Amino acid sequence: MQRRRKRRITTTLALIFGTFLFVTLFLSFILFPIHVKSDTMEDGLSAGGIAFVCPLLKKPERGDLYYLSRMDGHRESYLMMCADSFIRFFTFQQISPFSESSKSSGQPFVRRVIALPGDSIYMKDFVLYIKPAADKHYLSEFELSSKPYNVQIFSIPAEWDNVGVSGDLEEQTLKEGEYFVLADNRVESLDSRHWGAIKSERFLGRVLLQYFPFTSIKAY
């Protein structure tokens, strides 16, 4: 009887450890959920929504939504990232003990990839115009993207002209490994207009699916 009890306890502990290991590895390398807390990506991603990110996909195309590393340069240890993913998964994104921050630059964020390495770009009235390296003419971001999306652009008072991020940018050319990312809310969000081009190593994974709220399920 005692031997059977020990065997049952050992089996249970092995099952718990195996489940923990599987979930941790899955959330670290295959698919992990993120909680979208702001409206910077509406209508693409809903504020308060939860989406899946695939860390295996790190070769962006125009129009892709990508999860980017925090802009303050801080990186959590691998163990802390695994533990954070595990806790977030089982608390439905309500608790994230190792990634919470009060600073906008102190946590990972989602932005849309608009321009690729080698592109020449300029912005007019919050819309980016792009000339790929092999082309001779500029086209709008919407004409070049294979993925349809909408952006929030609304008129602002004249006294706001010098406040926040500009809706106009002079021509520039992206270098190798540089990407230009923008928020869908072009008036009230920080993005490459403020930070400059994003290096490829900042991509943590591509956003694949918003699965919550259930009334707004979207694939990207």
Task: Give each language-model segment a name.
Residues 2-4, 21-22:
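Classical N-terminal secretory signal peptides
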Residues 3-10, 43-220:
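Soluble "head" domains of membrane/secretory-pathway proteins
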Residues 11-29:
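Hydrophobic membrane-insertion alpha-helices, especially the h-region
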Residues 24-41:
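Aromatic-capped interface at the extracytoplasmic side
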